[in-house]
Amino acid sequence: MTESFAQLFEESLKEIETRPGSIVRGVVVAIDKDVVLVDAGLKSESAIPAEQFKNAQGELEIQVGDEVDVALDAVEDGFGETLLSREKAKRHEAWITLEKAYEDAETVTGVINGKVKGGFTVELNGIRAFLPGSLVDVRPVRDTLHLEGKELEFKVIKLDQKRNNVVVSRRAVIESENSAERDQLLENLQEGMEVKGIVKNLTDYGAFVDLGGVDGLLHITDMAWKRVKHPSEIVNVGDEITVKVLKFDRERTRVSLGLKQLGEDPWVAIAKRYPEGTKLTGRVTNLTDYGCFVEIEEGVEGLVHVSEMDWTNKNIHPSKVVNVGDVVEVMVLDIDEERRRISLGLKQCKANPWQQFAETHNKGDRVEGKIKSITDFGIFIGLDGGIDGLVHLSDISWNVAGEEAVREYKKGDEIAAVVLQVDAERERISLGVKQLAEDPFNNWVALNKKGAIVTGKVTAVDAKGATVELADGVEGYLRASEASRDRVEDATLVLSVGDEVEAKFTGVDRKNRAISLSVRAKDEADEKDAIATVNKQEDANFSNNAMAEAFKAAKGE
């Protein structure tokens, strides 16, 4: 009886393919923490690591009594045991599935689990496949994060088991699925209609939206009425959104989409809502070197130019005044509805130091401050409120030329001046230093009437004439032709530096601060006076003689 049973067992083994790598069916007879015991009808039961029976979530996929396919690793491993592998059996099954899918052009399910040069790796039931980057979608996809880790459908486009080479395409699946849907969409699509779609890709200039077999471009300028730096501020890959068809080129199958067009245009009649001079609050959305943008309502931004940020510092960087996100008060300066531009002012909502100065200072008032800078045309003095006043070169000294007088001053010096003029609108304050003292020129002219004989000292002379110092800070000019009664063509022949000169004050040019002198006119006047004196004396003598003769005649002498 025993011999016949052993004989029958040996014969049954012959019927089983026992070469290494063969696939046999077994029954799960026991499950332990680390191993699963499988009876495949061989000489002994085999212990297979439990890990080989777990799914991706780490859960056992079998229970006692289940039939499973396993691969023969070895019939006897030297200890009389048979080694089986569930992992190799699953891999064998996976290849069979792939071959069938490849031959029948069916889809397979897999997961994108890595990135390699030129594409991605996909796990297909334990088989590693290659997905070229160009076959991920019908359009180039830069970011695949929204696809990784998800179960997706693929088509096998190349299969070589010997070389363990599998190439798949997701694009082929999408094109196949979209074909019927695409035809229907293209037939019904019209400009102006609202459609739903899935954001599938973002670029710097917009987003591509899958409308169902047809991709449309949602340009960045059509995402929102407000300023958008990058599409990711408005939409993300995978978002389902409603958009409006703006343009549809049926022949080239190009669709332009709009998101902002779903709402009303906030720029319509904006000038009526915000007349020039209106003060309102807004949020700083962006900073540039030339200013900052402030959103005054949803979809409407205005520019505060750097020159409109601060009353006193025209070149201050915007980041020193405001930060992105700040809520600020601004004034509407100008609106160009056609160009969709609004000019806003920040400083106009603060006290104007120029206006304040104009209201608190009059012409002639004395002010003091530190010299902030010295330029080719004058001295800038710092005043209250952070503003500057200018002392022009011509207002530094009565007596010394501005270019020379300015050398007596340096940056940081405390200096006093007189207010000459205030133009708050043009933000200009004119100051004078020389006006702190009386004008010697005007004083001299007031004390000396035209025609008076004056004296002075020659300080400079050339052929054309001589400069004569009449008083401290007051000079007159004596032309060569006026230097003598005699004809003089070269003043140096009759005058020298240091000579005391007595001349007639013949004229004044207040604008150019020039006094005209004449020795000739003085001499002529002297001569005329002398003649008049002589004539007067002669007349007196004649009169006296005549009276004497008459007296004698009366006496009868």
Curated annotation (Swiss-Prot):
One of its GO terms (molecular function) is mRNA binding. The keyword rRNA processing does not apply. GO terms for cellular component: cytoplasm; cytosolic small ribosomal subunit; membrane. Induction: Represses its own translation via the N-terminus (at protein level). Disruption phenotype: Essential, it cannot be deleted. Upon depletion cell growth and total protein synthesis become linear. It comes from the Bacteria. It is found in: Cytoplasm. Belongs to the bacterial ribosomal protein bS1 family. This is Small ribosomal subunit protein bS1. It comes from Escherichia coli (strain K12). The lineage of its organism: Bacteria, Pseudomonadati, Pseudomonadota, Gammaproteobacteria, Enterobacterales.
